[in-house]
Amino acid sequence: MSVTQKKTEISTTTTYEGESRPSSGMSGFSYSAKIHPRTSGYINRSSQSPFRSSMGSNAAYTRSYDFSYGATAMPGRYANISSTGVNHVKANREREKQDMRDLNERFANYIEKVRFLEAQNKKLAGELEELKSKWGKETSAIKEMYETELEEARKLIDATNKEKITLDVRVTELIDQLERQQKDLEESRTYHQIDQEQIARQNQQLADLEGEISMLRRSIESLEKEKMRQSNILAKMNDEMEKMRMDLNNETINHLDAENRRQTLEEELEFQKDVHAQELKELAALAYRDTTAENREFWRNELAQAIRDIQQEYDAKCDQMRGDIEAYYNLKVQEFRTGATKQNMEVTRNKEENTKLKSNMTEIRNRLADLEARNAQLERTNQDLLRDLEEKDRQNELESCQYKEEITKLRGEMESILKELQDLMDIKLSLELEIAAYRKLLEGEESRVGMKQIVEQVVGARPNEAEVLSTILTRSEGGYEATGDSQISMKMMRGELAAKTTYQRTSKGSVSIKEADSQGCFIALETKKEENLTGWKIVRKVDDNKVYTYEIPNLVLKTGTVVKIWSKNHQAQARGDDLVSRENDTWGTGSNVVTILQNEKGEDKANYTQNTVYQ
């Protein structure tokens, strides 16, 4: 909290020719006030001017001004409640400080003029003495009363400013901490996004590998099926080969059987030959016993013919049997040889295919093992990333909860501070109104009949120097009286200033203006049923010389809901579905304010009027 004390000292010394008389009344006047500036410095100004009065006395006036003001920074919290509000307060402070300087200068000039007039107004000494005796005590009482009130007000302002500065510093620290936390949160979100992208890439690689594994498995299954088919073909060919081997064995057995039959038949033939030879011998013996040569010749010829026929028939039958057996045997041997060659070729081809399939299966199994190992590694990496992601999500949720709690706490503190600031602004507004009233009273006092002409005659007219006193001496009305040769005494008479504000609301339809902030922060709309406000316009007229407009964008107001349209300088207070007017820094303030809600056709649907009358 910074305190500035401004002190004006005016001293007067009067010397008369012929005799020295001490001046009666006030030989010095001092005034002090406390304000709250933003800079520090010290100004000392003095002047001395001798003059001669009409009564022949020499008077020397020494006027000195000591101005000191300073600013000190005290620790506190909440450095930035609202940049707009603080700038507004700063501007008002600077304006009030400048007004204080001007008023003090004018007050000093006014006192100087009155001192000059003392030499001219000796004839009024009795009346002034009477006024002094009559009003002196009342002035002291009023002065003490106002000094007590001002001291309490200063203490209250000092305590409030100290608490405000503490809260400002705390707000600054929390805002810095919030910015750091938000930066960490952004970094965490960036890392989270990178992890998400990496997980997506890993999932894509995993999907590709799973697709490749599935394709390899399908290839293995097809190769297994092909192998099974080849095995079935090989088994079938082995069965056929076994069958052919059995057929060959059967044919060999049949061949041996035929050989045996042939040998048997040959033996039987030899036996028949022997039998026939024996019969022939018997017949020959019978023939020999026949004495007839013709009979012997006949039987010999018949027997030879029979033997030849039998021999031819037997040879033909043996040749036929031999040819059939040889043909059948050669056919079977040829078929066996052809089948064995084909089977050998199939077996060789199957062996080559089996070898190739085995090598492919070995390669696929090795690759499958590598892919399974890589898949397991990727799954472990994916699990690790998921765990890290879950951990970061939990941390982010915890930090988010902490941030939300901090923000809620800060908003509560900010609301309380804004409420205090609003109270201070109301007090400040009342002080400004009282300052304006006091200024008018002083101007009226200066312009009383005869006073202005006397001042202009003695010291000359000085324009723009008729306003007096500071914002601290508010709610007061000033008067003056002078007694003695060089004495000035001040009397404060209590005055009052009141402000009366009236509000009037009208609406045509379901939508109405619920509230229009007197400080120009926001305008609140409410509706009794659902209404589409897209294209509607708000027109706010301030003291008939300033117009603020805002066109509502895409907005559908639900039944029973209230929406606030904030000015640009107060958009930090917007919440939820509230709107912000980017075109208007403020909605404006004044004594006569009219807020109108128009639909898209330009028809007035609602009206909110605010009138303030100062009394």
UniProtKB/Swiss-Prot annotation:
Residues 1-31 are annotated as: Disordered. InterPro entries: IF_conserved, IF_rod_dom, Intermed_filament_ifa/ifb, Lamin_tail_dom, Lamin_tail_dom_sf. It comes from the Eukaryota. Residues 146-284 are annotated as: Coil 1B. Residues 1-99 are annotated as: Head. Gene3D superfamilies: 1.20.5.170, Lamin Tail domain, Single helix bin, Vasodilator-stimulated phosphoprotein. Residues 304-449 are annotated as: Coil 2. Residues 96-449 form the IF rod domain. Transmembrane segments: none annotated. Keywords: Coiled coil, Intermediate filament. Residues 499-612 form the LTD domain. Residues 21-30 have a biased composition (Polar residues). SMART domains: Filament. Residues 136-145 are annotated as: Linker 1. Residues 450-615 are annotated as: Tail. Residues 100-135 are annotated as: Coil 1A. This is 70 kDa neurofilament protein.
